[in-house]
Every structure is written in structure tokens, then in C-alpha cells.
């Protein structure tokens, strides 16, 4: 895919646009280093790299593999110095201390049902300062970092009402809004157009036409086929299957072996199965956050933020997730 980069582009929705109805796993996919060495026949924990923003908790997932394929439990071995970390199941929450910035780290281990414990793995943390001037009043721990990431990178900014910013994490995302955010995340060059070529061109809002045309030109948008030709259906909610398909075309990182990786593939439409499998393998669309039983439901802003933040990390060149080399088809 040939993405042309352009600086300074942003999709900023004002309060009036948001109120009129116009137009997030994990912030920046946790980057996995090579596996740590573990005792023979025991589990192996992975080193991770994460980033968050000053004063904003990071919700992530610990990673480990066990040769027996059994259930694993996780425990913190050494606590971070610039924050605190808690573990619940496979998920962890890192909370920076007030005004903390810069580097930090903590270690964790994984244990299997037989009592074998891995050697400690290190989670390296970077706490960045916010520069956008945006601090949301309505994002919980699961969404806060991803939503902030989109604002800091000029991809999407919610509404400012009075002196407070609102992300509206439960608000449904339309096909047009998601496409616009994807193209901004990818840094695609978007130019003004008056016609898109879609049969429902008259129903596409002016702000969305340039994104629709760019999506077609870049090969990531094909529309919905009808007897009269393809339609964009800009205002329709976007489903997880559709979102995964668009992101898969943008990332273009190869295909995983579905029979090995994606056990629930038969629950997904055939046209979306490979894309969903690829995105789940990369934790852009992850089991536990977005289970396959939800793939035909509408994406919310919280969902979109987590997906786009993770995809943005990959697009910025951080492609070594520890999974790509193992999961791509030979």
C-alpha cells in the first residue's frame, strides 16, 4: 500500500459537530521483546514495552507461553519506582505517580497449574508528557491512554464543553468517522473533492467526501455492492468485522494461519475471517477485549480508540510484536 505522508493533518470534531451527530489492547500495542529464558518445561514470560501519558493509567495484558498449554497465573515480582501496578487475571494496570515522567519498569512472572514458575520478564514503561491541552473527563482506565494518544497525535479530539473535554467513549462510530480516523492515523494525504463516485454520493456529508475518495484511491475502501453500484453508507455504524477489514488493508503485515490462531473463525463472515484473525494476532483486535461473538455489533469510540492506537504504533514502525515472525504464513 502506498501511503503518502502529510504533516499537520487532524480530524478535530467540535462540540457543535458532535452534538449534531457528525463527525480504542491497548494504547500503542505493547511491544514484545524476545522471550526470556525459563526453566525447562515451565512457562515463558515475555518482556514488554509500553507507553502512557503523565497522570493516565495504562491497562494492558501480560504475555506468557506454556508448553503444556494450560492456564497461567501472573504475579508482580518487582514493583515500578514511578508508579504502581496491579494484576487481575492476565490484565495489568500501571498507574503513574503524580507528575511522573520518563522511564520506569517492573517485572512479572507466570506460573502454570503444576507450580512451575517462569523467570521474571521486564515491562519497560515510558511516561510521556501531554502537549495537546486535552484532558478528558469521561474516559475510564480501559480507554484513557488510547483516547489521549489519538488527541496527542492529532487523529481525533472530542468535544470541549465549558472548560471540560469529553470523549464520549460509549458513542457509536459511523463508517465515515472510522475511515477518517484510520486515514489520519496512517498519515494519508487527503484532498478536497466534490464527488466520490459512490452511488450514494449525495448522502455523504461534505467533510467525509475527501476521506471516502482517499480511501478508494488507497485501496482500503470498496463500499457495499448494490444493483446500482457501490454505496459508502457513510452514516451507518461500523461493525468490528468491517473495522478489522479496513485496518488489515492499511497495516498489510501478512496473514496468519487461521487454523492455528483463530479458533472462532467460523463465527465470523467469510469475507472478514482473515482480517479478524490477523488483527487478533497483532492485538489490534484482541480476544477478551473484542470477543468474536461481538464482531457484528457496532464499534464505539472506546473500541475505535484502542484499535487505532495499537494500529498507529505499528504504522510508526514498531512492528516487532514477537508474533509476526511466528504467525505469518510461509
Q: How should these model regions be labeled?
A:
Residues 154, 219, 283:
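Phosphate/pyrophosphate-binding loop motifs in nucleotide- or prenyl diphosphate-using proteins
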Residues 16-42, 46-54, 124-145, 157-179, ...:
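Feature responds to low-complexity, polar/acidic, surface-exposed segments characteristic
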Residues 62, 77-127:
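Acidic, turn/loop-rich segments in luminal/extracellular domains of secretory-pathway
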Residues 37-77:
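Extracellular ectodomain surface segments
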Residues 6-18:
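Sec-dependent N-terminal signal peptides
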Residues 150-152:
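Mature N-terminal segment immediately following signal peptide/propeptide cleavage
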Residues 1-4:
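N-terminal secretory signal peptides that target proteins for export/translocation
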Amino acid at each position: 500500500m502506498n501511503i503518502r505522508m502529510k504533516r499537520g493533518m487532524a480530524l478535530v470534531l467540535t462540540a457543535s459537530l458532535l452534538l449534531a451527530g457528525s463527525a480504542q489492547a491497548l494504547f500503542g500495542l505493547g511491544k514484545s521483546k524476545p522471550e526470556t529464558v525459563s526453566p525447562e518445561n515451565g512457562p515463558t514470560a515475555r518482556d514488554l514495552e509500553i507507553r502512557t501519558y503523565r497522570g493516565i493509567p495504562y491497562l494492558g495484558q501480560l504475555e506468557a507461553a506454556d508448553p503444556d498449554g494450560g492456564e497461567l497465573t501472573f504475579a508482580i515480582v518487582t514493583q515500578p519506582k514511578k508508579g504502581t501496578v496491579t494484576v487481575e487475571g492476565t490484565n495489568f494496570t500501571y498507574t503513574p505517580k503524580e507528575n511522573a515522567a520518563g522511564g520506569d519498569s517492573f517485572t512479572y512472572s507466570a506460573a502454570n497449574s503444576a507450580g512451575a514458575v517462569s523467570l521474571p520478564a521486564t515491562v519497560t514503561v515510558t511516561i510521556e508528557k501531554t502537549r495537546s491541552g486535552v484532558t478528558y473527563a469521561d474516559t475510564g482506565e480501559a480507554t484513557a491512554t488510547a483516547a489521549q494518544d489519538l488527541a496527542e497525535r492529532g487523529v481525533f479530539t472530542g468535544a470541549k464543553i465549558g472548560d471540560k473535554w469529553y470523549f464520549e467513549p460509549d458513542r457509536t462510530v459511523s463508517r465515515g468517522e472510522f475511515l477518517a480516523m484510520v486515514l489520519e492515523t496512517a498519515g494519508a494525504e487527503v484532498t478536497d473533492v466534490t464527488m466520490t463516485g459512490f452511488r450514494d454520493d449525495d448522502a455523504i456529508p461534505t467533510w467525509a467526501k475527501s476521506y471516502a475518495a482517499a480511501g478508494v484511491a488507497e485501496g482500503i475502501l470498496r463500499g457495499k455492492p448494490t444493483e446500482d453500484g457501490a454505496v459508502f453508507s457513510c452514516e451507518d455504524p461500523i461493525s468490528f468485522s468491517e473495522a478489522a477489514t479496513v485496518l488489515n488493508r492499511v497495516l498489510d503485515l501478512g496473514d496468519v494461519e487461521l487454523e492455528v490462531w483463530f479458533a472462532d473463525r467460523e463465527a465470523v463472515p467469510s469475507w472478514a475471517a482473515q482480517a479478524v484473525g490477523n488483527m487478533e494476532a497483532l492485538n489490534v483486535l484482541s480476544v477478551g477485549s473484542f470477543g468474536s461473538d461481538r464482531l457484528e455489533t457496532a464499534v464505539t469510540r472506546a473500541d475505535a480508540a484502542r484499535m487505532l492506537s495499537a494500529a498507529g504504533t505499528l504504522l510508526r514502525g514498531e512492528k516487532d510484536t514477537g508474533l509476526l515472525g511466528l504467525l505469518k504464513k510461509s
